[in-house]
Amino acid sequence: MAKGQSLQDPFLNALRRERVPVSIYLVNGIKLQGQVESFDQFVILLKNTVSQMVYKHAISTVVPARPFNVSSHHNTPNQAAGYNASHDDSAE
């Protein structure tokens, strides 16, 4: 698994699993809202009244509408509202 996805996948999976409403801001400033229906290495399926396939390279920020629990690959729960990567190996 790529280093960048060690945070990305658990974060997006928790959003999907808990059906947390999100605002996704694109690099061009457009704001999309909905729930993460599915995702892979390159895209996120965002569901609102319709499903939209959003390419990850076009995303600037993903903002959850409420706090939720994220389980990292170490199986330690993190609070998403204060989620930090202090255990990131690149800092060592």
Curated annotation (Swiss-Prot):
Role: RNA chaperone that binds small regulatory RNA (sRNAs) and mRNAs to facilitate mRNA translational regulation in response to envelope stress, environmental stress and changes in metabolite concentrations. Also binds with high specificity to tRNAs.
CDD domains associated with the record: Hfq
A GO CC term attached to the entry: cytosol
Family: Belongs to the Hfq family.
Ranges in coiled-coil conformation: none
Disulfide topology: none
Organism: Shewanella loihica (strain ATCC BAA-1088 / PV-4)
Bias kind Polar residues: ranges: 69-81
Region of interest: Disordered: 68-92
The name this protein goes by in its record: RNA-binding protein Hfq
One MF annotation (Gene Ontology) recorded for this entry: RNA binding
